[in-house]
Regions:
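Ribonuclease/tRNase effector modules and their secretory precursors
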Residues: 1-92
Length: 92
């Protein structure tokens, strides 16, 4: 399956957004369908980055006009990163 997006994190890890996950995001979070650029920017230049113990990292970027964060959840396994989901939230 093709990748919709490939972007590097500040520490050089390559993160991919696959077509399969993009379909999931569009179905579950339709407000994100026009936000590919924001998703890319959130991964590349997050306001906040929270690493969890299960190989999941959450990247947040504050959107001033909306007073919300874009959250992008990423899983990194064996050096390969991929987007799990993304949505807007008021909380970290």
């Amino acid at each position: 399956m093709a990748n919709i997006l490939e972007v590097k994190t500040k520490d050089g890890k390559l993160i991919r957004l696959t077509e399969k996950q993009w379909l999931h995001i569009k179905r579950r979070h339709p407000e994100m369908t026009t936000k590919i650029g924001d998703i890319e920017d959130t991964i590349a230049n997050p306001t906040v980055r929270i690493q969890h113990s299960d190989e999941t990292t959450k990247f947040y970027k504050f959107i001033k006009d909306e007073k919300k964060y874009i959250m992008v959840a990423v899983k990194i396994l064996n050096g390969h990163g991929f987007v799990i989901t993304t949505y807007k939230t008021r909380r970290l």
